[in-house]
Amino acid sequence: MKAIRTKRSIVAVMATVLAALALGATATLPPAVAAPSAGGQIPLQGAVNVRDIGGHRTYDGATVKSGKVIRADALSGLTDADVAVLAGRALKSVVDLRTPGEVQFMGADRLPAGVPLVARPIDDTGLFTQMMQIIQSKDPQRQQDALGNGGAEKIMNGVYASFLTAGSRAAFGATIRELASTDGAVLYHCTSGKDRTGFLTYVLLRAVGVPEQTARQDYLRSNDFRAAADAKLREQVKQAGYMQNPDLLIPLQEVRDDYLDTAVRKLEQEYGSFGTFLTDGLGIDGFTLVKLRKNLVG
């Protein structure tokens, strides 16, 4: 019986790891201390990077409204109490940016009754499969060769460059258009709430007039909210015998200026400016931008 429980535990850890390396995962921890009002955390038991993006100031002194946009990590591990918290947020829809493989491993979102779920998967450029093979190998040298000496950082820069593909742009653009026209709150998330969700939030905040440095700081705060959960995951990987050096995962677990810069440089190279990226890259016309700002800024 003990052997069966051990096997199940290892399988559970492996599922978490594989989903994690498809752009991070959430380890269930006690709610973190609430963050400052701008981009404040919504403390939950089953997700650690859930935030209302309201409170940020725009160039002209206005403020992004609270209760309109929530960014999050995966909602598959929410407790009943967590679901009740979200029920109090009057959600009009939830947008899931995860790939089907991630959903299969981590499970579907747990949502309040009646809240529509919209699947808009952002392709992970094969990262999920690649990491599955590397971690399952239990081969320290193979893991070092793939992730060490800048290998993990190279992988992440490739992920961020992929945010400019046609499929990714279509998903990001559709979500922003939904935010422009929804009367109520919208929650969007990926797995760890840091890369796809982080880039989308960065673009959204800049689109409504929040200064670039402020939008960047919001992006980087995922490191603070995720630190304890990510450390726990690395310890689980080591204890389960999958990696001798789980610190190789750190560049995959973190958000970094360099990763965001990869996407920003690419959009500037391809579109010339952030404004042109919004209109030509994401299909957000001037009328929609006006609606977006009116809906999200007060």
How does the language model describe each region?
Residues 192, 196-197:
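Ser/Thr-glycine-rich phosphate-binding loops at phosphate-binding pockets of nucleotides
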Residues 2-186, 200-298:
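Cys-dependent protein tyrosine phosphatase-like superfamily
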Residues 189:
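Catalytic nucleophile loop of clan PA
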